[in-house]
Amino acid sequence: MVEKTDIRVVRCGGSKINFRPPIISHDSRFVLCVSGDSVKVYSTRTEEWLHNLQGHNNQVTGIAFNPANQLQVYSCSADGTVKLWDFIDGILIKTFVIGYPLYSLYVSEKHEGVIFLIVSMVTDSNNESFQLVAVHLPKSAEQEVEAKELSTVASKISPNPSCTAFGRGGEFIAFSRHLQLNVYFFRKQKTYSFSLKATDKKAGKNAFTCVACHPTDDCIASGHEDGKIRLWRNFNHKKEYTYSTKHWHHDAVNHLCFTPEGSNLLSGGIESVLVQWQYGDMSKKEFLPRLGGSISHVSASADGQLFCTAHSDNKISIIESSFKVSGLIQGLVRGDAVSTDLMIDPRSKALVLNGKPGHLQFYSLLRDKHLYNLDIVQQEYIYEAGLDQFEVVKAVFDVKGSWLATVEERGHKTSDLEFFLKLWAFDETTQSFVLNTTVTEAHSERITSMCFSSSEETTMLVTTALDGQFKAWCQTADAQQAQNYWSCDFVGSYHNLKPKNCCFSADGSILAVSFQEVLTLWSPETWELLTTLCQPPGEIRDLCFGRLSCSKYLLSTTTKNLLCCWNLLTCALEWSTSVDVSRLQSDPLSENVAAFSFESKHTHLFVFKPSEPRPLFSQRYVCLERVDRAVFVPREEPFNSCDESCQWLNRSQLYFLTHNMDLLTFSSATEEDRMLSSSKRLVIDESVAVTPFYLLLGRHRKQQHKLNTETQEPADKPQHTQGSVTIKQLLHTPAHVLPAASVLCSMFVRSLLISNTGVREEMDSSEQEMDSEKEEEESEEEMEACDGQQELRAQGSVDEQKPKLSKAQERELKSLRKTDFSWMTSLIDSKP
């Protein structure tokens, strides 16, 4: 058995982006949000994910812009560190080690070099207590610095970041907990407390849920469980304080936010309606309804042009100041629980699972982006606590991705159970699934499982239910409507036992159906019962056929913590082992099978082939939660790994979902390094960011450079020093600081032109030499006519005695011979 080597469990996306309030950059071009152990940066114009700020080892719990630099952002995490980032380029600037788990982060313009954190302190009675502390950030050239200078500002505060807010730029801080509002003044170093009764005259719930401070006035807005909003004034006096009450929300107010100039107050709650209250006249308000899930956070940009709302369905809405939604950033929708399995759409290769109520969501794992929702229930969802509504509980694709089967139900009690079986056909025109058939009474009791045939030649759906029957559904032609619909083709049962699981073999020739402790094998062509396999004690929990060379094996797990492997050729038990398997998942492209085991409050992973009981790979303590959902995702390009422990990841990648709704995957260090070098690398050549444009043009320039090297001598190659610098500046300067394209065009073209100054000078010199030689030849011809013999003798004597001269010396001599010395005659004539 190969033990754990360099394979690690990593978050592959889908983390909560609504965990903390999103923040908008000062120029309203970027929105930053917490996402698991990283911070995601999105564009407000395109809603596209730009990059991640990765470096924390635990959940990020707060983010805030650096008041001294608008292009920097602080982030705090439960790992006990605060990091300072350049969020434009995604570069980590500095890490401050605090040493305590951090739950929220606040900054103030009037407190330079100081940040405020909510930390957890354990008291003598082992009760967790939260404190607000001020941390003085030391100035150091080192990248990692310890910041141990903490001073307590307030004790026994709420860990909810919405219950703490700074007022008047940092003159005071307001924080609420239960029924008490506290205001701490930094200059006076004094705290004033104000309390409310548990219930008022109308039996309302007065507990505080959030607070917000006006940016310029002495006013504090508080939200409460009963949906009321209170505006507190004169809170610098214990007895003379006043408050006014406004009420619109029918349930708890989740978040409050003043606009930067303080002219409006924004509020949000479970109603999915953003309410804008006019500060001067609270009776005037505007509404932006139907935003999706309940609003959990509200934030505004520094210029007041954009608002952001974070929703319970893991979505961020970008809203203009005119109260118009301009963009949506949708993460992996995280409901209370996932009823369907994790599936891969054969066409789009997207991850498919439960989305918002009554929908299936299609999510791109490669881009970490929500693609679209498919409305299964096709009914308006009412956001009201305790209301029983339809939910999608089962879904499955056929082999080609042409058909989708879903089961929706409502009613927690058997007598009130109502469910529908729906079959959806893929429409090539709309590139989506269209409802084809609805079966209102597919079974008399709840459907427990369903699966499509794995054969591409026939399309067949099998369902099992607690009514003791399994049914096979096939397509039937409708002559009147000129289309196919689905109908029941066969009904099977076994000794009045209740079936729970079903699956087809790799070639679709055998159907396996489990009836409590008995395995039954059926022929889909004749519906003949081929054989039964007597399972060891315990009801069958899961079934899985082997693939490729292991297709003759059938795996099953039981409630008695047994994993069994059956040989279908001999109809005998090949091997079995005692292990509590919570999820059994086969790889469609190999013989490998992954088994998640839950023991001692931890989940462990075993990867094996059914033909070999000894695991190929094992990793203990994968996560703390139980894993019930997993899927193998085929890779677009096979990953060639020579390491024996990583070979099971070559063709497919294993994803799994925890009870905490964290989507995780297994990745090798080699694969992460390869991805980092290709797409996440931040510096190269003089610490310049790598962009796709640079990689494309840079490759072309390297090829051209190689070609020039092969065809020309090094001394003959022109130097493009200035042009190269210009091109580098154009390619590597951040887009937000570049001038307009019209200005860059002429500069870029000029930089590509070869400088001809040296060539022109050389050409001029050559022309002068040619003219000089021509004139010299003419002069020599004239001299030959008058004294040819003397010239011949002089020339002969020179040829015999002169040393070899360089070309430069010869040119100089020729120029001297050309010089006009006629001016000397005047001197000779004037001599007495």
Swiss-Prot record:
GO terms for biological process: positive regulation of rRNA processing; positive regulation of transcription by RNA polymerase I; ribosomal small subunit biogenesis; rRNA processing. Keywords: Nucleus, Repeat, Ribosome biogenesis, rRNA processing, Transcription, Transcription regulation, WD repeat. Residues 764-785 have a biased composition (Acidic residues). The keyword Nucleus applies. WD repeats lie at residues 4-43, 47-86, 90-134, 148-187, 196-233, 239-278, 281-320, 326-364, 378-425, 432-474, 485-523, 527-567, 572-609. SMART domains: WD40. Its main location: nucleus. This is WD repeat-containing protein 75.
